[in-house]
Amino acid sequence: MSNVVAFLSNKLTLRGTEVAIFDYADYNEKLLGNKSIIITRDYEKIKNEYDVDIQAYNKFQSRFKVCYYQNQEDIDTIVSDNNISHIFIIKAGALDGVISTRCKNIIHCVFTTCQPHGQVYTPIGQSINNLQGTSYPVMPHIVTLPNCDDDLRNELNIPQNPVIFGRYGGKESFDISFVHDAIKSILEVRNDCYFIFMNTNVFYEHKNIIYLPGTSDMIYKRKFINTCDALLHARDRGETFGLTCGEFAICEKPVITYGQSRENEHLLILKEKAVIYNSFDDLFSILKTFTKNKYDMTNNGYMFYNPENVMNIFKNICLI
């Protein structure tokens, strides 16, 4: 018998959290034969909150029934009105009052497992368990992209030969200052490389640095990855899953990343496939000596997280 499963995020953004929610909801229908409903807060009421993006709202509304809440009572009403059997709530992990009293609650923890609640309490990565000293079953994200061979080099007026390092994610999460310095320095000694940054706060202007707005278009995102020769990842706190790292990795693009982050799920997944720097000098050397096809990304750990494998975990952990 099929279930009606609601997926709740308190706002819809262009970040990995909402990419993950969309994929869970999509494949809950396509692979598990259930019905998916999205629950979030109304764009018009929260449009000035950080990261809220109308593109994300439009994307979800074009695919799913979307219901809006303001408080816990609203959530219960939506659950009753739609005969929802399970509600999958992605949140930091703390007990925050966002829950339903009328169905099974799956609490999907992005940062902490310190306040268990709901019928299922599950982190997005083992690194959260490691940091918190817990042992909850892990519900990882799906890593998938549409098939597309096109890139953006012509559109961005970049020749075919230069090496291109790229990055997307939260606007503020490219935040390691010595990485900014290394980019400035490498552009003084290599004129055959470009940096393209999507949804990234401007930190330096240069003719070989291109800033692009964020997008919810996964085909455009695939073209962006196809344009790049590597991901340059520089989030000081690290990743509790690392969807951007995963999206580059399944396209066999090297992931150049900081090795000292507290949250290190991306390092646990990539293992020896990660291209790690710990200092300005490390990164400068990596960028200076980088050539296309230098690093082998075949059979890297993120390739496990395809829709079939992850939704099998979802069925066994979440749909109890």
Tell where the protein language model's regions lie, with residue ranges.
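Nucleotide-activated donor-binding/catalytic signature segment of Leloir-type glycosyltransferases, i.e.
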Residues: F197-I219, K223, T227
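Short hydrophobic beta-strand element within catalytic cores of glycosyltransferases
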Residues: P254-G259
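Conserved donor-binding/catalytic core segment of Leloir-type glycosyltransferases
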Residues: A6, N147, I158-F174
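Donor nucleotide-sugar binding/catalytic pocket of nucleotide-sugar-dependent glycosyltransferases
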Residues: F111-T113, G118-D149
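Acidic donor-binding loop of glycosyltransferase active sites
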Residues: I84, K223-T240, K253
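Short alpha-helical segment that forms part of, or immediately flanks, the ligand-binding pocket
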Residues: R222, C245-I250, N264-E265
